[in-house]
Amino acid sequence: MKIAVLSRNAKLYSTRRLVEAAKTRGHEVRVLDVLRCYMNIASHRPSIHYKGEDLTGFDAVIPRIGASVTFYGTAVLRQFEMIGVYPLSESVAITRSRDKLRSLQLLARKGIGLPVTGFAHAPDEIDDLIKMVGGAPVVIKLLEGTQGIGVVLAENKKAAQSVIEAFMGLKTHILVQEFIKETAGSDIRCFIIGDKVVAAMKRQAPEGEFRSNLHRGGSASLVRITPEERSTAIRAAQTMGLNVAGVDILRSNHGPLVMEVNSSPGLEGIESATGKDVATKVIEFIEKNATRGRTRTRGKG
């Protein structure tokens, strides 16, 4: 098969591993910088060009689209879909999961466990917003943040008010969530391919930190997940319509709660924590499922 990997940087661990795994299994692979692709959006013969060349003959495309290039990255992916190339995850599923609010609303509609979450832009009654999610301590997030950036733990009401006011000054949208203290700065990342959890790791925040993102110095270790955690993670990925996803789950006293569904989960942390060859599993999934022109929108909303 001829596979395209949409990635800004061919040297990144995840991109390297996917290329390696595909080549080992006898496929032809090209890494394309998504921002350098340009498109002819025509109803007759839509095309994608890259460095002066018409990109044709691809059987599948693997999107590794960073949060900062979501808009253009998903547009390029949509163009690949238009010319009949099989996407590992569809453009609409990626945009759905990148919008934190939209994804939370969809998960809530499906009855999937979530932390109590308030959403606001310019609330007149900050006290009422804090009360709505069960009072301090609360976690306050910028809607557009990634990798733990723009996430603040406010330990008391006064701190929560100050942070919300500061964020409001930025003219941005704010998520206010209950703080699940029993997790003690840890979460579980489930790596989903298709309808299976192929690997899972526990991420632990460093001492004195509550954000467990590996980019923030968190550590990862192998973990056994419960059947309930497994089914929650799979349902969350399917609600987004993603074939490949990293679902972050908190172990609360009242069952698993989904924090986030990541459409471009990194491979380095999960492969080193679990010793599993996740990249090859991704390529095997493409081999089984890639047929030309087969994009259908899964999930609703």
Curated annotation (Swiss-Prot):
Residues of the ATP-grasp domain: 104-287
Disulfide bonds: none
Single GO cellular component term: cytoplasm
A Gene Ontology biological process term: SOS response
Binding site for Mg(2+) 2: E260, N262
Encoding gene (name): rimK
EC number(s) recorded for this UniProt protein: 6.3.2.-
GO molecular function: ATP binding; metal ion binding; ribosomal S6-glutamic acid ligase activity
UniProt cross-references to Pfam families, sorted A to Z: RimK, Rimk_N
Name of the protein described by the UniProt record: Probable alpha-L-glutamate ligase
Positions annotated to bind Mn(2+) 1: D248, E260
Top class in the EC scheme: ligase
Positions bound to Mn(2+) 2: E260, N262
Record-linked HAMAP family: RimK
Organism listed in the record: Nitrosococcus oceani (strain ATCC 19707 / BCRC 17464 / JCM 30415 / NCIMB 11848 / C-107)
Cofactor binding remark: Binds 2 magnesium or manganese ions per subunit.
